[in-house]
Amino acid sequence: MKKLCINISLFFMLLTLSSCNDWLDEVKQTTTVSDEIIWQDETQVDKYVNSFYPLLHDYGQFGEAQFYGSFTESLTDAFKYGSYTLGHRAGHPNLYVLTPDAISPDNCLYSIWLRSTAYKQIRETNQFLSLQRKYSEFSADRNKLWEAQVRFFRAFVYFQLAKRHGGVILYDDLPVSTNKARSSAEETWQFIADDLDFAANNLPKEWDAANKGRITKGAAYALKSRAMLYAKRWQDAYDAANNVIALKLYGLTDKYEDAWKGN
């Protein structure tokens, strides 16, 4: 009898362990996320795309990647100290005026190469696009919407490089070599134009309320218009600006002060 009870107990123990294994097989791993797992969940991909949006601040007027977050007017005769320069950079504009030797070949503050910032971001956009091609099984329209946003940001970073250096090294995929030749200025501007054309063709004019603030068709056209001015491609700049106007979503503010309200 005792032996029978032991056998029955062992049977139910094994049955329980088997059920546990089945349950564990169904649990998604969330503490460490693989590339493949991200591309199985639309929400996770949206978050992946969101990781590129801080670039708008980083390379904006007050961003750390743009002249250390300080005013570039301090390099000109038009300098006037502003009311807002980020945190510990607050005194930098005055520093540049009073001690111009603070800027040297070894301490070039007007640079976006610090910590390999620009090409690090370009590599991350290319990594997103590479993983998308490899793993995404979402609809073509959904994929284009993600790709359009990421290619906008790739163009945005290349624009920061091109307006300073002209031709730069172009990567449209993950690099296989660190010795790639520098492209011409014309090739660089065309690369930027192509990315922005794709973005403009695949982004919506407006997003729903839940996605307000995302890159739009108008933003892609506007950036292309500005980039083509630097490239001296006047007709392309004109056409892109007209495309923004044709959307009938934007206009000049009645009062200059309203331009700073961020609405």
Regions found by a protein language model. Name each.
Residues E42-D46, N50, P54-G60, T85-H165, ...:
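Conserved, well-structured interaction surfaces
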Residues C20-T72, K255, A259-W260:
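Membrane-proximal, proline-rich intrinsically disordered regions
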Residues L10-L14:
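Hydrophobic helical h-region of N-terminal Sec-dependent signal peptides
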Residues V33-E36, F62-L86, Y171, P204-A220, ...:
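Short, surface-exposed recognition loops and adjoining beta-strand edges that mediate ligand/DNA contacts
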Residues M1-I8:
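Bacterial N-terminal signal peptides that target proteins for export
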